[in-house]
């Protein structure tokens, strides 16, 4: 077991705060419309350029164990904010540093850390209530675009594309972000149900230019088991041929003789057919096939119910307006399912989401819900270089998460203004002693820091701007760091999701409270062994040589 290094009191906290300062100084430069990029060296490939606070925070690991403990605590505030609200990571970092620094000064001056924490908690809860009261629900596409624009560092195109995607698939719909293979940035909307299984043979392709199989008005056969022999299916295949309509087979797998027979019939033109594997695994596969059955008004042929392929009639097959199958995906458009049955299935999945305690199960259920209740929108992000595409993709993902948060809990005035004005009612809070009052004062001062940092990143004096705004009674009155003007932030479209602002403050206060109430720190003692030489940027596995 490694020997331990033990530090006590203010010395331990001071060293932790040094680590917090190192991380916060790297992250804070990204805040606001005029925040800067950070370049991060990576073990392999080209460096990463980002303006995403949590990406910067996650990349930092300090050599000194005690300083690193502080940095890791601060990193946890940024990470938690990103997980819960999807944005606000830099704000959380700036707030946590300010709260921890001021709190430590007072602990060193003899204040009771537990009472300081109680005072801070009182203040934070009051600010959270103030944020909730001042939040405004967003409904219009324009407001959604504004949130996306601000969260993506003022990129209007990103805001507009996210708003368009949400309009197409609904606020609850599935929106994914992918790298495009060209320079453009597009929204591709897939109407209907899409799942990640492609055709089992390229011979099923009907459009050789796009390499997709397109089936118009097809029948859909859903079979729970593997298909290795078509003999039991002959009656149903003959009925489909007579109807002169295409057939899509979705089964656990189609293999051997069965697949070969389908391919031969497809090539001879006797049967327009395509086969794909069923999506998902195990019980989830069965549930997804039942979803498809309801969506297409078909039946899942399952031996659990005593159903056999040879007894299946054409009435048991589902139907849809169109099915498009690529090498990797299948899209069922306009299934002919009964609307009432689909709504009942949606309600059933929603109740399962409410009951489950597993995050993984919840995510998979939400995917099923989205597939049934809406379409799928794909934001395809392009650019001139790989570095540019990755940087922009990061911003798109941030903006998408922030927009979802805005739809959920509404928006407040942006640019740090809401936190600044929310500090004013805190002076009226009732406390039990002067130490708790000092805890409230810590929060009041810290709430000025995000706005100060935004202004300073824009090249102006943060203290002067804060003073001017506090003189103004209008809570929406703020400083537009992009145009360097004082404006009504809501009217100017400078808005933040209430959930992002709230989460940033709560996570920051949680971490700061841990730091000021820490009295002893135990870390592994540094090893005397010489560390191996680190690889320099270059070819991985080639001794770090640069050519």
Swiss-Prot record:
<keyword id="KW-0963">Cytoplasm</keyword>
<feature type="binding site">
    <location>
        <position position="496"/>
    </location>
    <ligand>
        <name>ATP</name>
    </ligand>
</feature>
<protein>
    <recommendedName>
        <fullName>Chaperonin GroEL</fullName>
        <ecNumber>5.6.1.7</ecNumber>
    </recommendedName>
</protein>
<keyword id="KW-0547">Nucleotide-binding</keyword>
<feature type="binding site">
    <location>
        <position position="51"/>
    </location>
    <ligand>
        <name>ATP</name>
    </ligand>
</feature>
<keyword id="KW-0067">ATP-binding</keyword>
<feature type="binding site">
    <location>
        <begin position="87"/>
        <end position="91"/>
    </location>
    <ligand>
        <name>ATP</name>
    </ligand>
</feature>
<dbReference type="GO" id="GO:0042026">
    <property type="term" value="P:protein refolding"/>
</dbReference>
<keyword id="KW-0143">Chaperone</keyword>
<comment type="subunit">
    <text>Forms a cylinder of 14 subunits composed of two heptameric rings stacked back-to-back. Interacts with the co-chaperonin GroES.</text>
</comment>
<dbReference type="GO" id="GO:0005737">
    <property type="term" value="C:cytoplasm"/>
</dbReference>
<dbReference type="InterPro" id="IPR027413">
    <property type="entry name" value="GROEL-like_equatorial_sf"/>
</dbReference>
<dbReference type="InterPro" id="IPR002423">
    <property type="entry name" value="Cpn60/GroEL/TCP-1"/>
</dbReference>
<dbReference type="Pfam" id="PF00118">
    <property type="entry name" value="Cpn60_TCP1"/>
</dbReference>
<feature type="compositionally biased region" description="Gly residues">
    <location>
        <begin position="537"/>
        <end position="547"/>
    </location>
</feature>
<dbReference type="GO" id="GO:0005524">
    <property type="term" value="F:ATP binding"/>
</dbReference>
<keyword id="KW-0413">Isomerase</keyword>
<dbReference type="InterPro" id="IPR001844">
    <property type="entry name" value="Cpn60/GroEL"/>
</dbReference>
<feature type="binding site">
    <location>
        <begin position="30"/>
        <end position="33"/>
    </location>
    <ligand>
        <name>ATP</name>
    </ligand>
</feature>
<dbReference type="InterPro" id="IPR027409">
    <property type="entry name" value="GroEL-like_apical_dom_sf"/>
</dbReference>
<dbReference type="GO" id="GO:0051082">
    <property type="term" value="F:unfolded protein binding"/>
</dbReference>
<dbReference type="GO" id="GO:0140662">
    <property type="term" value="F:ATP-dependent protein folding chaperone"/>
</dbReference>
<dbReference type="InterPro" id="IPR027410">
    <property type="entry name" value="TCP-1-like_intermed_sf"/>
</dbReference>
<feature type="region of interest" description="Disordered">
    <location>
        <begin position="527"/>
        <end position="547"/>
    </location>
</feature>
<dbReference type="InterPro" id="IPR018370">
    <property type="entry name" value="Chaperonin_Cpn60_CS"/>
</dbReference>
<dbReference type="GO" id="GO:0016853">
    <property type="term" value="F:isomerase activity"/>
</dbReference>
<comment type="function">
    <text>Together with its co-chaperonin GroES, plays an essential role in assisting protein folding. The GroEL-GroES system forms a nano-cage that allows encapsulation of the non-native substrate proteins and provides a physical environment optimized to promote and accelerate protein folding.</text>
</comment>
<feature type="binding site">
    <location>
        <position position="415"/>
    </location>
    <ligand>
        <name>ATP</name>
    </ligand>
</feature>
<comment type="similarity">
    <text>Belongs to the chaperonin (HSP60) family.</text>
</comment>
């Amino acid at each position: 077991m490694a020997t331990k290094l033990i530090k006590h009191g203010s010395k331990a906290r001071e060293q932790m705060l040094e680590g917090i300062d190192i991380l916060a100084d790297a992250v804070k430069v990204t805040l606001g419309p005029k925040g800067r990029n950070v370049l991060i060296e990576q073990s392999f490939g080209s460096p990463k350029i980002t303006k995403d606070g949590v990406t910067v925070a996650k990349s930092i690991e300090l050599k000194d164990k005690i300083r690193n403990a502080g940095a890791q605590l601060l990193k946890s505030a940024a990470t938690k904010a990103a997980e819960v609200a999807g944005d606000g990571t830099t704000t959380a970092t700036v707030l946590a540093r300010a709260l921890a620094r001021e709190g430590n000064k007072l602990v060193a001056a003899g204040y009771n850390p537990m009472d300081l924490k109680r005072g801070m908690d009182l203040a934070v809860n009051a600010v959270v209530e103030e944020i909730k009261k001042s939040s405004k629900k967003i409904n219009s596409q324009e407001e959604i675009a504004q949130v996306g624009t601000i969260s993506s560092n003022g990129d209007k195109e990103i805001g507009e594309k996210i708003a368009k995607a949400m309009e197409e698939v609904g606020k609850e719909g599935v929106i994914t972000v992918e790298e495009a293979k060209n320079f453009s940035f597009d929204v591709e909307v897939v109407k209907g149900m899409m799942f990640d299984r492609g055709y089992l043979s390229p011979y099923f392709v009907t459009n050789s230019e796009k390499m997709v199989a397109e089936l118009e008005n097809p029948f859909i056969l859903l079979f729970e088991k593997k298909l290795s022999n078509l003999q039991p299916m002959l009656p149903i295949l003959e009925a489909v041929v007579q109807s002169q309509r295409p057939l899509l087979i979705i089964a656990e797998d189609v293999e051997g003789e069965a697949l070969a027979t389908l391919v031969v019939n497809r090539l001879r033109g006797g049967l327009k057919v395509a086969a794909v594997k069923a999506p998902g695994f195990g019980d989830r596969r069965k549930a997804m096939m039942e979803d498809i059955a309801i969506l297409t008004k078909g039946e899942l042929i399952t031996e659990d119910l005593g159903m056999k392929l040879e007894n299946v009639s054409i009435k048991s097959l589902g139907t849809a307006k169109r099915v498009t199958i690529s090498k990797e995906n299948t899209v069922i458009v306009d299934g002919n399912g009964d609307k009432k049955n689909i709504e009942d299935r949606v309600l059933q999945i929603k109740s399962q989401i409410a009951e489950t305690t597993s995050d993984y199960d919840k995510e998979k259920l939400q995917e099923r819900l989205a597939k049934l209740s809406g379409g799928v929108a794909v934001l395809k992000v392009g650019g001139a270089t790989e570095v540019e595409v990755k940087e922009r993709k990061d911003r798109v993902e941030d903006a998408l998460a922030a927009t979802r948060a805005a739809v959920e809990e509404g928006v407040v005035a942006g640019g740090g203004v809401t936190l600044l004005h929310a500090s004013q009612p805190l002076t009226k809070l009732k406390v039990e002693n002067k130490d708790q009052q000092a805890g409230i004062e810590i929060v009041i001062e810290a709430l000025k820091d995000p706005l100060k940092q935004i202004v300073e990143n824009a090249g102006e004096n943060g203290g002067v701007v804060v003073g001017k705004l506090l003189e103004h009674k209008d809570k929406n009155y703020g400083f537009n760091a992009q145009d360097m003007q004082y404006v009504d932030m809501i009217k100017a479209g400078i808005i933040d999701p209430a959930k992002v602002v709230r989460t940033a403050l709560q996570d920051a206060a949680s971490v700061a409270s841990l730091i000021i109430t820490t009295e002893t720190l135990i870390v592994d003692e540094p090893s005397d062994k010489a560390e191996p030489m680190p690889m320099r940027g270059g070819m991985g596995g080639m001794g770090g040589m640069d050519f």
